[in-house]
């Protein structure tokens, strides 16, 4: 199975917010709100936004399958950066970087992810563009839902 071609989804997105980095960081790290903000996050067991934390996640998006994975926060620098590794049905890395802007702050999300297990693996192999659209849907809707829920 590992010999089959995989499709990696690379992402590098920037989002402008009209609040300071500190205010944005406070909102982003309210992990007890994640399931309220994002209804497609079916299960989430995170307790803290801190280096060394392991979060078990189950995502059910618009496609007819779920993704189960673990996020390990490897580096967290308050109001600056968080870097994580993902393992499970999705593998790879993700990085969140906050920067000052003329009016407020900028959140940059970079990632390199590949489906490694479950039905997502087959969808990715057979329909790379569908996997990319699903990834984009989660990111785009996630930011929109975050903005609506937090007001930032």
Positions of predicted regions on the chain:
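Beta-strand/loop substructures that line and gate deep hydrophobic ligand-binding cavities in soluble
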Residues: 85-140
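Glycine-rich portal/gate segments that line the openings of hydrophobic small-molecule binding cavities
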Residues: 4, 45-90, 141-152
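A short, structured loop/turn motif at beta-sheet edges
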Residues: 18-22, 46-51, 74-79, 97-106
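Intrinsic-disorder/low-complexity, polar/charged segments enriched in Ser/Thr/Lys/Arg/Asp/Glu/Gln
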Residues: 8-16, 54, 68, 81, ...
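Hydrophobic pocket/interface hotspot
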Residues: 24-28, 34, 55, 73, ...
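Hydrophobic ligand-binding cavity/cleft-lining segments
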Residues: 1-50
């Amino acid at each position: 199975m590992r010999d089959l071609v995989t499709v990696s989804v690379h992402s590098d997105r920037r989002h402008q917010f009209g609040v300071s980095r500190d205010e944005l960081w406070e909102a982003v790290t309210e992990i007890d709100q994640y399931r309220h903000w994002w209804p497609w996050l079916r299960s989430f067991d995170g307790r803290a936004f801190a280096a060394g934390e392991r979060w078990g996640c189950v995502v059910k998006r618009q496609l007819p399958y779920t993704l189960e994975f673990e996020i390990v926060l490897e580096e967290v620098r308050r109001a600056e950066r968080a870097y994580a590794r993902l393992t499970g049905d999705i593998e790879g890395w993700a990085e969140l970087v906050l920067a000052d802007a003329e009016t407020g702050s900028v959140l940059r999300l970079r990632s390199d992810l590949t489906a490694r297990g479950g039905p997502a693996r087959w969808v990715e192999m057979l329909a790379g563009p569908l996997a990319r659209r699903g990834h984009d849907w989660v990111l785009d809707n996630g930011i929109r839902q975050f903005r609506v829920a937090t007001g930032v």
